Curated annotation (Swiss-Prot):
Keywords: Cell inner membrane, Cell membrane, Membrane, Protein transport, Translocation, Transmembrane, Transmembrane helix, Transport. Belongs to the TatA/E family. The gene is tatA. It comes from the Bacteria. Forms a complex with TatC. It is a single-pass membrane protein. This is Sec-independent protein translocase protein TatA. Its main location: membrane.
């Protein structure tokens, strides 16, 4: 996971705990979760819109001289 070992992750978590305090961690986690949920929702909507636009676009046909006659 990002090239971090167990000791590095524990150190990062301890620093976060010291900076924000134990009482604010659940609130921060909720906010992060909501943000990720909104991001994934927007990503899915954009992908669906893009796929629908591709499906709705008729394939362009190359005209040949025989087609014009």
């Amino acid at each position: 996971m990002f090239g971090l070992g167990g000791q590095e992750l524990i150190l990062i978590l301890l620093i976060i705990l010291l900076l924000f305090g134990a009482k604010k961690l659940p609130e921060l986690a909720k906010g992060l979760g909501r943000g990720m949920k909104e991001f994934k929702k927007a990503q899915t909507e954009i992908e669906e819109e893009f796929n629908n636009a591709i499906e709705d676009t008729p394939a362009q046909k190359k005209e040949t001289i025989k087609d014009k006659e």
